[in-house]
Swiss-Prot record:
Gene3D superfamilies associated with the record: Aldolase class I (3.20.20.70)
HAMAP family named among the record's database cross-references: FO_synth_sub1
Keywords: 4Fe-4S, Iron, Iron-sulfur, Lyase, Metal-binding, S-adenosyl-L-methionine
GO molecular function: 4 iron, 4 sulfur cluster binding; 7,8-didemethyl-8-hydroxy-5-deazariboflavin synthase activity; iron ion binding; transferase activity, transferring alkyl or aryl (other than methyl) groups
Protein name, UniProt field: 7,8-didemethyl-8-hydroxy-5-deazariboflavin synthase
Substrates-to-products reaction catalysed: 5-amino-5-(4-hydroxybenzyl)-6-(D-ribitylimino)-5,6-dihydrouracil + S-adenosyl-L-methionine = 7,8-didemethyl-8-hydroxy-5-deazariboflavin + 5'-deoxyadenosine + L-methionine + NH4(+) + H(+)
Originating gene: cofG
Pathway where it operates: Cofactor biosynthesis; coenzyme F0 biosynthesis
Record text on subunit structure and interactions: Consists of two subunits, CofG and CofH.
Length: 352
């Protein structure tokens, strides 16, 4: 077990030998030498959001709300491509936008969650894809409602420090209050929803705040046992965002955070997005990641549209180069495929 003080000392190290010593413990954890990925389709249901984060390009005041037929067409194509995950994403509290609400009303829906539920249920009934929803803060009741049609759900913690709410990253983003995000992650645990969360590196946080965030995820998981994977995501600068000139975290910063995450979060998969780390992905594989996350042969990453997915053959090639076997997985990890963790209709779909 590593303490917070030991973790901080490790992040401050500039000795390659001392850093590599920590890898000995990592290498014994993934003795199977496998790295997983999920073949998915990214469905950006609506790109309006109440949050205006300093690093984001997803939000658009001139929003687009995908029509039901558009989503069904994407899902049908994804099914033909052999995808098994339908990633449904939209901005937080889109119902706050009267124009979005009016569009939904014209189509016969009282809100975005009813709309999402219907397309998710259609997805389960008509394709081999399993829904995974990531749409910002949801209440306990909303999570319970969506659990019926989701194999797993997700919300990035990003960081557990409230200090960032007064910085350029989150000063215009009420939904990035860490207390709200922690409450939702805990509620997902109470409801036994297999869950994905993660931290965002390079948005103005201190080393101590990075460590506190990982330990907060550990605390929640030890209480509820529902966190199946943790994403260690690096900030990437983009043109025309408020944080355009902010420095990106170095590969060594990421390398050390991955090692720490693997040591602290025992039994939880650690993921790094491969499209944000095409040049450094193999380095992070050496540091202990065991999952590449969702990769789509059909749709782009609408949150990071400037960063195309590597194709699966490319992922396979540089995984094999380090002796790892690339293995496809579902959006719900195998240990959560049971009636304890999944709604009956989702479980029946998987067993078919």
């Amino acid at each position: 077990m590593i303490t917070k003080n030991e973790a901080l000392d490790f992040l401050k190290l500039n000795s390659i030998n001392s850093i590599l010593e920590k890898l000995e413990g990592i290498n014994t954890q993934n003795s199977s030498k496998t790295i997983t990925f999920s073949k998915n389709a990214f469905i950006p249901v609506c790109n309006w959001c109440r949050n205006v984060c300093g690093y984001c390009t997803f939000r658009n005041e001139n929003f687009k709300l995908l029509k039901m037929d558009e989503m069904k067409e994407i899902l049908t194509k994804a099914n033909a491509f052999g995808c098994r995950e339908a990633l449904f994403t939209f901005g937080e509290n889109v119902d706050e936008n009267e124009k979005v609400k009016e569009e939904l009303k014209k189509m016969g829906y009282y809100g975005i969650l009813e709309y999402l539920y219907e397309i998710s249920a259609w997805c389960l009934e008509n394709t081999n894809l399993l829904p995974h929803t990531n749409c910002g803060i949801l209440s306990y009741d909303e999570l319970e409602y969506l659990r019926e049609v989701n194999a797993s759900m997700g919300l990035m913690l990003e960081n557990s420090s409230a200090r960032l709410c007064s910085t350029i990253a989150h000063e215009k983003s009420p939904g990035k209050d860490p207390n709200l995000r922690i409450e939702m992650i805990e509620n997902a645990g109470k409801l036994k929803i297999p869950f994905t969360t993660g931290i965002l590196i390079g948005i103005g946080e201190t080393l101590e705040e990075r460590i506190d965030s990982i330990f907060e995820i550990k605390r929640i998981h030890e209480k509820y046992g529902h966190i199946q994977e943790v994403i260690v995501q690096n900030f990437r600068s983009k043109p025309l965002i408020p944080m355009e000139n902010y420095k990106e975290p170095s590969p060594i910063e990421m390398f050390k955070m991955i090692i720490l995450s693997k040591l602290i979060l025992e039994g939880i998969s650690i993921q790094v997005p491969p499209n944000l780390n095409r040049e450094t992905g193999q380095l992070f594989l050496m540091a202990g990641i065991d999952d590449w996350g969702g990769v789509s042969p059909l749709t782009k990453d609408f949150v990071n549209p400037e960063a195309p997915w590597p194709d699966i053959e490319e992922l396979n090639s540089f995984s094999k180069e380090l002796g790892f076997e690339l293995k496809e997985r579902l959006p719900v990890y195998e240990k959560y495929i049971s009636k304890e963790w999944l709604d009956k209709k989702v479980l029946e779909k998987i067993k078919k």
